[in-house]
Amino acid sequence: PBKALITGFWSKVKVBZVGAZALGRLLVVYPWTZRFFZHFGBLSSABAVMBBAKVKAHGKKVLBSFSBGLKHLBBLKGAFASLSZLHCBKLHVBPZBFRLLGBVLVVVLARHFGKZFBPZLZAZFZKVVAGVASALAHRYH
């Protein structure tokens, strides 16, 4: 991946807004992913999910970790080792969910940035989200 392009763009991302929307959309578009978040409360409708304070807070937490990972593009497996262990060994998250979240994140970035999120930038982010998803699923291999 083009580190300079990725980090330069990422500095413009409002992690709290994008994270909240990405996680919310994941839960709405792929409702089976809600099983890990049932304790958050009412997730019975798209509006309930998108307005849920716990979903928003966890979405920010997810993207804060993603931001940290961008500082280690040469060692994503190392950067996400402890989160891989948590999500795989303790929470038993389906590794496919990491790929789905990456796909949703790309959609949200395109929505927020429009023409600025051009095909070249999208291609770079597709590589990054695939790398992060692979790193998070590493404990399954």
Curated annotation (Swiss-Prot):
SUPFAM superfamilies on file: Globin-like
Segments forming domain Globin: 1-141
Note: This type of beta C chain is found in non-anemic barbary sheep, whereas the other type of beta C chain is found in anemic barbary sheep.
Tissue-specific expression: Red blood cells.
Listed GO CC annotations: blood microparticle; haptoglobin-hemoglobin complex; hemoglobin complex
Biological processes annotated in GO: hydrogen peroxide catabolic process
Superkingdom of this protein's organism: Eukaryota
Similarity comment: Belongs to the globin family.
Subunit structure comment from the entry: Heterotetramer of two alpha chains and two beta chains.
Organism expressing this protein natively: Ammotragus lervia (Barbary sheep)
Binding site for heme b: 58, 87
Listed name of the protein: Hemoglobin subunit beta-C(NA)
Biological role stated in the UniProt entry: Involved in oxygen transport from the lung to the various peripheral tissues.
Single GO MF annotation: hemoglobin alpha binding
Swiss-Prot/TrEMBL keywords: Heme, Iron, Metal-binding, Oxygen transport, Transport
